[in-house]
Regions:
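Conserved, mostly hydrophobic/aromatic
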Residues: 19, 43, 91, 105, ...
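Short, acidic/polar
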Residues: 22-33, 75-81, 151-159
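Alpha-helix-loop-beta-strand connector modules within alpha/beta enzyme cores
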Residues: 51-72
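Non-cysteine beta-strand/loop elements that form the S-adenosyl-L-methionine
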Residues: 93-97, 165-172
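N-terminal amphipathic alpha-helix/helix-capping segment at the start of soluble metabolic enzymes
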Residues: 1-18, 130-136
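Single conserved hydrophobic/aromatic residue that forms the stacking wall/gate
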Residues: 173-182
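Active-site beta->alpha loop and helix N-cap motifs at the rims of alpha/beta catalytic domains
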Residues: 66-90
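Conserved anion-binding
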Residues: 93-161
Length: 182
């Protein structure tokens, strides 16, 4: 299986430089993929990108050595599994507020017996290689977004979830009101 470059960099303690794609365009994905980023995140939550746009963007990124990631719009297993099947090598999941939500997210990214991801990585096999299923659980990055007061209060239990690789903390939403930062 194609190695997840940024997962390796993280395990070696190296910094990772990640770009962000919110415009549904293969041209912008191609331009960004040739600018020296270690990874690019396709934003399916607050960007203008949906699955029909994300797939050709993933194909474009895959022609380079940049690791493709996606921020999904919700902790919805079907969407998570589908974008992984399309060749995404990591997921950023928004609005993870407790351990149960973190477990649901991580398990959607992993095949049985570690999770409940269904098997259908048509594009994942093309991009990742013929042994994709054997190594996918270990190679896929799983990041939870910490965006609520509840998630801050339960941060230790969220971080204890086996298979979770890291977190993104969004301070704007962890305050009682987003207006507090205005």
């Amino acid at each position: 299986m194609r190695e997840n470059k940024i997962k390796k960099m993280m395990s070696e303690g190296k910094p990772v430089i990640n770009g962000w794609l919110q415009i549904p365009s293969t041209v912008s994905a191609e331009a960004m993929a040739h600018q020296g980023w270690d990874s690019l995140t396709i934003d399916m939550q607050h960007g203008l990108v949906d699955y029909s746009n994300a797939l050709p963007m993933l194909q474009t990124i895959s022609s380079t050595n940049v690791t493709p990631l996606a921020r999904v719009n919700w902790n919805e297993p079907g969407q998570i599994m589908k974008i992984l099947d399309a060749g995404c090598y990591g997921i950023i999941c928004p609005m993870v507020s407790n351990k149960e939500e973190a477990e649901k997210f991580v398990q959607a990214c992993m095949y049985p017996p570690n999770g409940y991801r269904s098997f259908g990585p048509v594009r994942g096999l093309i991009y990742g290689g013929s042994d994709y299923a054997k190594h996918a659980d270990q190679e896929m990055l799983k990041f939870a977004m910490i965006e609520t007061k509840e998630s801050l209060d339960k941060l230790d239990e969220i971080m204890s979830v086996k298979g979770l690789d890291g977190i993104y903390i969004c301070l704007l939403y962890t305050s009682p009101s987003p207006r507090d930062f205005g």
